[in-house]
Amino acid sequence: MGVTYQLVGTFAVEPILARLTSGQLPDVSGFRSIVGNEAQLAYWMALSWSLAAFVEEIAYCGWVLTRCAEIGRFSKGAWVGGASSALFGAVHAYQGLSGVFATGLTGPVFAGVYLVTGRNLWATIVSHGVLDTTGFVMMYFGVYPGI
């Protein structure tokens, strides 16, 4: 799931969002050091799996999603999806407006994985880690747009 979502997001969703928002793809220039550099690839993947995949999913699916569901019992689907997506996207503001929207769309995907798997956080953690790993490997080989 992570590989497919990364590829579709990178080559289809992000260009469309860029045209609809700022006209620019998400700013991933902070990751240029990864291109052709195994040490940087390993460094960013370690950070990604520990902080992005593990911590973000525990925070967003494990805590925010559950709290939003408790607050918005009367309209769980829309409330939970909107609130968790907005927060998930906002954390990625360093990528610019199109990056905020792109990651905001990722929020409901991970929330869906979490709910479909019976609230299994490991399913979202692994999906998030695989998605980020795919992106970093694309950056390493210099094929990620904007890198």
Model-derived segments and their meaning:
Residues 14, 65, 139-143:
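Juxtamembrane/transmembrane-helix interface segments of polytopic membrane transporters
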Residues 90-98:
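Membrane-interface helix caps and helix-loop-helix hairpins in membrane proteins
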Residues 56-60, 95, 131:
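Short active-site segment of divalent metal-dependent hydrolases/proteases
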Residues 1-52, 70-73, 145-147:
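Juxtamembrane helix-loop-helix connectors linking adjacent transmembrane helices
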Residues 55-83, 112-120:
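Membrane-interface helix/loop boundary segments of multi-pass membrane proteins
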Residues 40-45, 76-84, 99, 103:
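Residue-level signature of transmembrane alpha-helical entry/exit and packing/kink sites
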Residues 82, 98-147:
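Functionally important transmembrane alpha-helices
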